């Protein structure tokens, strides 16, 4: 975050970073398509077998693709993030070519999100739409985002349209948790952890949460899978740790949203920061149902984008000065002529 604040100090730098990030996103999408239409390579297949990931990724009715990420949950949520990020960026881009490019990346990201079979990933674009409706300060955009979000929710929660498609059917279970056996098991596991951690305000200890930590010790917290980033942090650092963690991340996001709504004067920068804020908010919501938020590269990316949000006021002031200097230079040239 500190490095981002020190280096990402101009609108042009943020624009270049966004374009570079879109290229990396396309690489991830293409790799996901390769896995879907051609298949896993030998290294990926061996990794699935040796790590036990085949139990959650090679399902009877669907194969969950993970591209270049650690698992399908990480890949799916990141595709939801890039769908929101480049969708909003493309929507407000003034350059026709760049607008088309970003909107295409957004659409490909949305499709890739569905190929992962990650139910919690659908929360990312929905959460992004929700925040967009709140901070856009544009009645038409707020109305469109609200209507769009409601339509998506109604489609998944109250209809059976597209039920023959397994990807849609699997995503639909995220909106009907009480009918989902996986959700009920997670709920029971959290109740067990709550009872166990009642007298441990600082948790069980770093690295001692989740079944992947069995090699470090055999205890209750290493026998229960952490299917949520927040549950994992709560298990390892206790109620004190999770409160501090949420305060830092939520505070940073709220700080950025405050600047977007009331301080940033340049529209092009406001739209870019809005896209980042909406994407990060969606990821934070999705982290409740998936333990991906601290994994590579998601953890680094979220800290980096929050750093840009918190640096928004300085970037805006610098952009204003650059515009004034450009206008002054143009005026001098005109007077000389």
What annotation goes with each model-predicted range?
Residues 9, 18-31, 79, 102, ...:
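Transmembrane alpha-helices of multi-pass, membrane-embedded glycan-processing enzymes
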Residues 53-55, 59, 162-164, 172-237, ...:
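Long extracytoplasmic/lumenal interhelical loops at the membrane interface
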Residues 96, 100-101, 109, 130-133, ...:
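Hydrophobic transmembrane alpha-helices and their immediate junctions
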Residues 275-334:
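Transmembrane alpha-helices of multi-pass inner-membrane enzymes
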Residues 66-67, 71-73, 109-112, 201, ...:
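A conserved mid-to-late transmembrane alpha helix and its immediate loop/hinge
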Residues 30, 35-40, 113-116, 133-177, ...:
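A membrane-periplasm/extracellular boundary helix in multi-pass inner-membrane enzymes
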Residues 3-13, 87-95, 130-139, 254-262, ...:
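Structural signal for the C-terminal ends of transmembrane alpha-helices
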Residues 15-47, 53-61, 66-135, 257-258, ...:
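Alpha-helical transmembrane segments of multi-pass inner-membrane proteins
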């Amino acid at each position: 975050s500190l490095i981002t604040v020190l280096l990402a100090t101009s609108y042009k730098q943020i624009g270049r970073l966004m374009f570079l990030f879109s290229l990396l996103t396309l690489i991830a999408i293409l790799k996901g398509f390769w896995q879907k239409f051609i298949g896993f390579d030998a290294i990926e297949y061996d990794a699935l077998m040796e790590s036990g990931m085949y139990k959650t990724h090679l399902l009877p009715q669907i194969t969950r693709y993970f591209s270049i990420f650690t698992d399908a949950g990480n890949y799916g949520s990141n595709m939801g993030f890039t769908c929101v990020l480049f969708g909003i960026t493309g929507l407000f881009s003034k350059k026709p070519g760049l607008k088309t490019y970003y909107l295409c990346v957004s659409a490909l990201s949305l499709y890739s999100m569905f190929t992962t079979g990650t139910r919690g990933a659908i929360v990312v674009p929905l959460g992004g739409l929700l925040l967009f409706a709140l901070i856009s300060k544009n009645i038409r955009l707020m109305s469109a985002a609200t209507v769009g979000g409601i339509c998506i929710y109604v489609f998944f929660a109250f209809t059976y349209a597209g039920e023959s498609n397994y990807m849609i059917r699997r995503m639909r279970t995220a909106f009907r948790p009480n009918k989902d056996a996986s959700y009920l098991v997670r709920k029971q596991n959290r109740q067990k952890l709550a009872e166990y951690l009642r007298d441990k305000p600082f948790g069980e200890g770093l690295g001692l949460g989740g079944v992947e930590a069995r090699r470090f010790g055999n205890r209750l917290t290493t026998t229960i899978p952490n299917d949520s980033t927040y549950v994992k942090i709560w298990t390892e650092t206790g109620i004190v740790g999770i409160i501090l963690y949420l305060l830092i991340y939520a505070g940073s996001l709220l700080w950025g949203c405050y600047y977007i709504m009331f301080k940033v004067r340049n529209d092009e920068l406001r739209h870019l920061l809005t896209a980042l804020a909406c994407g990060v908010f969606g990821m934070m919501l999705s982290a409740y149902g998936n333990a991906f938020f601290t994994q590579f590269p998601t953890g680094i990316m979220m800290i980096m984008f929050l750093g840009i949000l918190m640096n928004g006021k300085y970037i805006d002031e610098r952009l204003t000065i650059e515009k004034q200097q450009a206008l002054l230079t143009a005026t001098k040239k005109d007077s000389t002529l």
